[in-house]
Amino acid sequence: MRFAFAVLAVLAAASSPVRAEDDAPVGEKGRPAEKGTLGVGIIVGEPTGICAKIYLAKDRALQIAAGSAFISNGLQLHADYVFHPWILQDRDSFVLPVYLGPGVRFIDYGGGSQGDSHFAAGLRGVIGMLFDFKNAPLDAFLELAGIVEYDFKSGNGAGAALNFGGGVRYYF
């Protein structure tokens, strides 16, 4: 139950009206103006696979990933709507913003030793840190996500999980 309250707190913080550098035009503070809005790359952790991020505005983005969930032993797909409310550092060569937001996760748990496969769907609350290079079309990230999910296998019901990962994306 405490975990559910923590996820709700993350979701409430994500909907907060506070935004990073609202008055600064793109290119002066935050994301470089010449960088593309679509990034494609790899994520390592839980899951390990491919990821993409598309900026909808300078401080909001949609990020997705698909890959193998080694700890959970299955194929995972997730999507998050993230906000970049705080910039920790803004240097000549990089920007270091924090991001957070709500999302969804779908996972097909593999058979394991019993050989039975089952499907679960859930809500994610993600928080992460982005190392956004200003002089190259790259970023690197670390993120932690809490998940409340429903397992559709009879008898398993609701559950909770954590995902942690890091990765690199190239922007077009």
Ranges and model annotations:
Residues 7, 14-18, 39, 68, ...:
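A general structural-boundary detector
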Residues 54-140:
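Gram-negative (and chloroplast) outer-membrane scaffold detector with strong preference
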Residues 74, 134-172:
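Predominantly the C-terminal beta-signal and adjacent terminal strand-loop region
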Residues 1-30:
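Cleavable N-terminal export/targeting peptides
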Residues 20-71, 76:
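Short glycine/proline- and aromatic-enriched beta-strand/turn motifs that initiate or cap beta-hairpins
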